[in-house]
Structures are given as C-alpha cells and as structure tokens.
C-alpha cells in the first residue's frame, strides 16, 4: 500500500491510497465505511444529444467521481473491490455509480473521523510494502542470484559466482558461505526464504544453511526451477510458492493466538470471549490482547454499535488489538466464539 496524500486536521480529513496488492484491497474493505466520501478515476457513459439518437454508440469516458459510500463488496478472485453509492462530486450528481478499485487504483478517502485501527492498518500495510517478506535465492553449481519480492515485481539484489580453482570442495564451501553472508546482511528478520534452482545444488546449500544459520534457515523452503536469474525468479512466482508463504505467515500468527486463547479457555484461565466478558475484563484493565474478527468489526460499525469504544479502551490501557481474517480458519473459529475475545494480563472473575 502506498499513501500518496495525507491531509488531516485532527482525525478529520483525506488520505489518498494506491492499492499495490490483493491484501491492500482487503485492507481497504475494512478502512472504508458506509458514509465515507471516496474519489477515484472511473468510467461512465457520457450522454449527449447525438448519443440519444444512436444509443448503441454511447461510449464510456474516464472521469473522476466522488461517491458517498453505501455498499462495498470484495471480489477476491476478480482482484477487485466494488464501492457503490450516489455521486456527490463530478458528472451526474445524484445518480448512483460503482467504483471498481483494483491493484494500481488510486483512491482518496474522506472521513469525518478516522479511527485508530484504520490509521494503524494503513501504517502497517504501508510498512509491509517497503520491506521484502520473501527473498528468493536461485542457485545452481557455481552461480547464485538473490532477489527480493516486492509488490511491483522482483528486485535483483546480487549475483554470486564461485571462484575457479583446483580445491573444488573448499571453493564450494566458500561459495555457499558468501551466499549466507549476503543473506545475513540483506534479509529482514520476519522474511521467508525460497531456495530455488535446477538439480541438487539447492538441497546441498540448504543443508549448509541449516548448519551455519539454523534460525534463518528454519524459514527456508526449496522450489524446483529450470534455471536461475530473473527467469528462475519468475518460475518461483508462477508456481505459487510466494503466495503460499504470504498466506501461511498470517495464518501462523493468528493460529498461534487462537491456540493461546483456546488453551486459556479450557483451563478457565486468563481469557475472555464474547462482548459481555471482554467489556467486563476491560473494566479491570485486564485486556492484554484483543482478538476481533474482521466481519464482526465491519458489522458492528454498520449497526452503529459501540465497538470502536471497546477498541479505544483497549489501546488506552496499553493493550494490543489484532484483527483476524475470517477468510482463514483461525478467524472462522473466532467468529464462532462471538467474533471477539481477549487474552488477559490476569484472570477476572464475576
């Protein structure tokens, strides 16, 4: 996600955003609310006198419209967020229109009051876009390429070539050591690593990696490709390894929190679930981590419930708020528990 403009007075005002990934479109679904004013470039039929005489000739023109949000629908498999409502700025004011927000679309969102979790979601998505979540090492005998997976494609970080000489085994170890040294300097702590390439060199390197950097190597997996270099990087992307890693990373975080919650519930320990119990725990300042399903958050806001007051109270008490995706199993489990739960600093009774 890229923020292209931020114009706020206190909590009121406009933030312009360009969606760079499918995740960004999903984030926008929970940032934009009913009643917001959203601007974007879109296509709309331009009626004229000649068009009315020949209706089959009516063409759509590109215009910038501002619509008051009434409905939203996220089409995951079409990579599109549809925002529907009456036009307030631009041509055909008062008529209804649907904005199709896709990867690469820039939109401006104007709110009377931006909420903490919405601003935090933007910040987290923006920071995620700046650091590589996945690093690819494409390696074959004597040659290796390291690339960062960015939202806009693959950034080639370095090319490493094994020196030539008679001491082949020693040179191979030196070659592997150079790759590991570069990974130590280049790879963020939370990044996963895909080791790709033809033949068995990648397995030999992974073994060396585990021996020299076991913690970093624990986040590595291998993928077969027919070559290295940019073509090898593209093969990794086509095979879906990067998409699986990104999804599994989120699922792993949410699964871990859900396991902690269910364990505490089973022991009648430091946990609360359902709005009534969570609000009760909040009164005592006991909430350490609030878990809330994205659909519960969206539905609560649409119904005008005091859900944002709960989030604010958690943050004021130095607690953490984690929004779960109901697209994955941990989020589904949370939704079945009432959509909201909390891991507590201490047990609360009564």
Curated annotation (Swiss-Prot):
The family database entries (Gene3D superfamilies) matched by this protein are listed as: 3.30.1330.30, eRF1 domain 2, Pelota, domain A
Instruction: List localization entries.
Output: Cytoplasm
Q: Mind telling me which InterPro entries this protein's record contains? A: eFR1_2_sf (IPR042226), eRF1_1_Pelota (IPR005140), eRF1_2 (IPR005141), eRF1_3 (IPR005142), Pelota/DOM34_N (IPR038069), Pelota_arc (IPR023521), Ribosomal_eL30-like_sf (IPR029064), Transl-rel_pelota (IPR004405)
Q: Which key words are in the record?
A: Cytoplasm, Endonuclease, Hydrolase, Metal-binding, Nuclease
Q: What Enzyme Commission number(s) appear in the record?
A: 3.1.-.-
What SMART domains does the entry give? eRF1_1
Q: Where are the transmembrane segments?
A: none
| One annotated Gene Ontology cellular component of this protein | cytoplasm
Q: Does the keyword Cell membrane apply?
A: no
One GO term under biological process is:
ribosome disassembly
One GO MF annotation is: endonuclease activity
Q: The organism sits in which domain of life? A: Archaea
**Which cofactors go with this protein?**
a divalent metal cation
Where is it mostly found? cytoplasm
Its job? May function in recognizing stalled ribosomes, interact with stem-loop structures in stalled mRNA molecules, and effect endonucleolytic cleavage of the mRNA. May play a role in the release non-functional ribosomes and degradation of damaged mRNAs. Has endoribonuclease activity.
Record's subunit section: Monomer.
Can you tell me which family this protein belongs to? Belongs to the eukaryotic release factor 1 family. Pelota subfamily.
Question: What is recorded about the domains?
Answer: The N-terminal domain has the RNA-binding Sm fold. It harbors the endoribonuclease activity.
Do you know which HAMAP family this protein is assigned to?
PelO
Please report the name of this protein according to its UniProt entry.
Protein pelota homolog
Q: Which organism is it from?
A: Methanosarcina acetivorans (strain ATCC 35395 / DSM 2834 / JCM 12185 / C2A)
């Amino acid at each position: 996600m890229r923020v292209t403009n931020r114009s706020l007075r206190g909590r009121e005002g406009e933030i312009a955003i360009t969606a760079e990934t499918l995740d960004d479109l999903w984030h926008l679904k929970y940032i934009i609310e009913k009643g917001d004013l959203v601007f974007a470039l879109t296509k709309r039929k331009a009626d004229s006198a000649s068009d009315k005489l020949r209706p089959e000739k009516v063409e759509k023109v590109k215009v910038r419209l501002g619509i008051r949000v009434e409905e939203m629908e996220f089409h995951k498999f079409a990579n599109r967020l549809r925002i529907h409502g009456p036009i307030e700025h631009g041509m055909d004011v008062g008529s209804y229109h649907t904005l199709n927000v896709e990867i690469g679309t820039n939109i401006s969102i104007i709110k009377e009051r931006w909420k903490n979790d919405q601003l935090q979601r933007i910040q987290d998505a923006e920071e995620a876009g700046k650091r590589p979540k996945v690093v690819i090492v494409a390696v074959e005998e004597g040659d290796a390429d390291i690339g960062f997976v960015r939202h806009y494609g693959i950034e080639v970080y370095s090319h490493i070539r094994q020196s030539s000489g008679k001491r082949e085994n020693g040179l191979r170890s030196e070659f592997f050591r150079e790759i590991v040294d570069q990974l130590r300097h280049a790879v963020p702590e939370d990044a996963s690593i895909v080791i790709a390439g033809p033949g068995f060199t990648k397995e030999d390197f992974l073994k060396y990696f585990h021996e020299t950097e076991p913690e970093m190597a624990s986040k590595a997996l291998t993928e077969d490709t027919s070559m290295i270099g940019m073509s090898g990087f593209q093969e990794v992307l086509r095979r879906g390894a990067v998409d699986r890693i990104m999804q599994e990373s989120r699922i792993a975080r949410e699964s871990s929190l859900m396991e902690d919650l269910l364990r505490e519930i089973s022991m009648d320990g430091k946990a609360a679930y359902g709005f009534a119990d969570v609000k009760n725990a909040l009164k005592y300042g006991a909430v350490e981590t609030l878990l809330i399903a994205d659909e519960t958050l969206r539905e609560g806001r649409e119904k005008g419930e005091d859900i944002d007051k709960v989030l604010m109270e958690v943050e004021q008490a130095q607690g953490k708020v984690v929004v779960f995706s109901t697209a994955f199993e941990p989020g589904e489990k949370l939704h079945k528990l009432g959509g909201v739960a909390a891991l507590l600093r201490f047990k609360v009774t009564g």
